[in-house]
């Protein structure tokens, strides 16, 4: 078996990726989220496949088909709840995974990081088109508001929006194409994940200290396979608890009403995992400005490697940068809260301040902190 594992063309790839892979001996539980994201993706693809067998992408029957899945299909309610809450678990793991990358300086593996940012954008696009499919009130109005932002692009905006819609508003053509996108994108994500891992295995994993770990490595199996298995158990337990005990707690009550173009919900908002970006979008009282800020809030991740000024890679021994990092984390939670609030005083000003602080921290304060820490570490004569 050992020889087969090391000689068979397919087994050899698996062996070098998951069995005999040399891994740093000191990586903590923060390194579990990559494998957890893999499990989330598999769960989403499997549950999504079974949902697609019963779903109809037509404006007249989409809402009813989702109700039919929950009422009449064997374990349809469970599959639907796992799929809807699986998305929340996916994004929770994603945000923690990105946060880990920022804290420990993993972004200095530029290729891996850039593919990761593309993955994040692709997953966000997939979740957005997926949220439209049940064709409830929030599905319809969320799609209308977000796709309408394209019309803010000068000259080609209106044409582009109508091209995406397949008409003059969000309608049957939009729903059909969004279903097609939602079906194909997870497979594109799978391909990108393979590229992400390919680049990661070129350099090997980073570790909490940020120091080159080549002198002290251990095989991935059994050490990290067992450690990952523990993470899987926690993830599946949390997902099952959420799907079985409070499946609708993260959704919007408006989505229990069928889509009605003549009746606008009192407060249009996306799912919780988009609220931070939605708050940044709303904090600028100009359509094009808001769209640019929304894009910048995610694309700013691409320039983080170029803003690294510290002599040390990880924040483990950099208390000032650590403090700023946790302020950034708290700020993102604040933005998430603001995104779910109505547009009125004092939420408007809080959102504007939090949005400003978000860009200020990443673009100015954190690079300055790195330079200051370098200065503090210089031997004084």
From Swiss-Prot:
A GO biological-process term: mitochondrial electron transport, ubiquinol to cytochrome c
Source organism, top-level taxon: Eukaryota
Family matches, as CDD domains: cytochrome_b_C (cd00290), Cytochrome_b_N (cd00284)
Coiled coil, from the record: none
Cofactors required: heme b
Binding site for heme b b562: 83, 182
Binding residues for heme b b566: 97, 196
Keywords: Electron transport, Heme, Iron, Membrane, Metal-binding, Mitochondrion, Mitochondrion inner membrane, Respiratory chain, Transmembrane, Transmembrane helix, Transport, Ubiquinone
Entry's cofactor comment: Binds 2 heme b groups non-covalently.
Residues binding a ubiquinone: 201
UniProt-recorded Gene Ontology molecular function terms: metal ion binding; ubiquinol-cytochrome-c reductase activity
Chief site of localization: mitochondrion
Membrane topology recorded in Swiss-Prot or TrEMBL: Multi-pass membrane protein
Location within or outside the cell: Mitochondrion inner membrane
Entry's Gene Ontology cellular component terms: mitochondrial inner membrane; respiratory chain complex III
Listed transmembrane segments: 33-53, 77-98, 113-133, 178-198, 226-246, 288-308, 320-340, 347-367
Keyword Heme: yes
Record text on subunit structure and interactions: The cytochrome bc1 complex contains 11 subunits: 3 respiratory subunits (MT-CYB, CYC1 and UQCRFS1), 2 core proteins (UQCRC1 and UQCRC2) and 6 low-molecular weight proteins (UQCRH/QCR6, UQCRB/QCR7, UQCRQ/QCR8, UQCR10/QCR9, UQCR11/QCR10 and a cleavage product of UQCRFS1). This cytochrome bc1 complex then forms a dimer.
Additional remarks: Heme 1 (or BL or b562) is low-potential and absorbs at about 562 nm, and heme 2 (or BH or b566) is high-potential and absorbs at about 566 nm.
Family: Belongs to the cytochrome b family.
Functional summary from the UniProt entry: Component of the ubiquinol-cytochrome c reductase complex (complex III or cytochrome b-c1 complex) that is part of the mitochondrial respiratory chain. The b-c1 complex mediates electron transfer from ubiquinol to cytochrome c. Contributes to the generation of a proton gradient across the mitochondrial membrane that is then used for ATP synthesis.
Name of this protein: Cytochrome b
Species: Ningaui timealeyi (Pilbara ningaui)
């Amino acid at each position: 078996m050992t020889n087969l594992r090391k000689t068979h063309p397919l087994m050899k790839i698996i062996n070098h990726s998951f069995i005999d892979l040399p891994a740093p001996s000191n990586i903590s539980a923060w390194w579990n989220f990559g494998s957890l994201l893999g499990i989330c993706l598999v769960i989403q693809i499997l549950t999504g496949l079974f949902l697609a067998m019963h779903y109809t992408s037509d404006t007249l029957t989409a809402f009813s088909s989702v109700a039919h899945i929950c009422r009449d299909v064997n374990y349809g309610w469970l599959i639907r709840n796992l799929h809807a809450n699986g998305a929340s678990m996916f994004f929770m793991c994603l945000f923690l995974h990105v946060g880990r990358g920022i804290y420990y300086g993993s972004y200095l593996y530029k290729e891996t990081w850039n593919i990761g940012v593309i993955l994040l954008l692709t997953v966000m696009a997939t979740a957005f088109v997926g949220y439209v499919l049940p064709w409830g009130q929030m599905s319809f109005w969320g799609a209308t508001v977000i796709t309408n932002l394209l019309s803010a692009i000068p000259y080609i905006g209106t044409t582009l929006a109508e091209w995406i819609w397949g008409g003059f508003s969000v309608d049957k053509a939009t729903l059909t194409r969004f279903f097609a996108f939602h079906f194909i994108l997870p497979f594109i994500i799978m391909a990108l994940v393979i590229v992400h891992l390919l680049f990661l295995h070129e350099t090997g994993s980073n570790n909490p200290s940020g120091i080159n770990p080549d002198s002290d490595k251990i095989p991935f199996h059994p050490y990290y396979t067992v450690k990952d298995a523990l993470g899987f158990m926690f993830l599946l337990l949390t997902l099952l608890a959420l799907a079985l005990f409070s499946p609708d707690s993260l959704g919007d009550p408006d989505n229990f009403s069928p889509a009605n173009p003549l009746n606008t919900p009192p407060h249009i908002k996306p799912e919780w995992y988009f609220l931070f970006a939605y708050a940044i979008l709303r904090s600028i009282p100009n359509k094009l400005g808001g769209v640019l800020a929304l894009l910048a809030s995610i694309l700013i991740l691409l320039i983080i490697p170029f803003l690294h000024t510290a002599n040390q890679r990880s924040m483990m021994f950099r208390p000032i940068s650590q403090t700023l990092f946790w302020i950034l984390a708290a700020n993102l939670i604040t933005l998430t809260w603001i995104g779910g609030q109505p547009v009125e005083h004092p939420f408007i000003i809080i959102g504007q301040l939090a949005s400003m602080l978000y860009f200020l921290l990443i673009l100015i304060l954190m690079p300055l902190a790195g330079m200051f820490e370098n200065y503090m570490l210089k031997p004084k004569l």
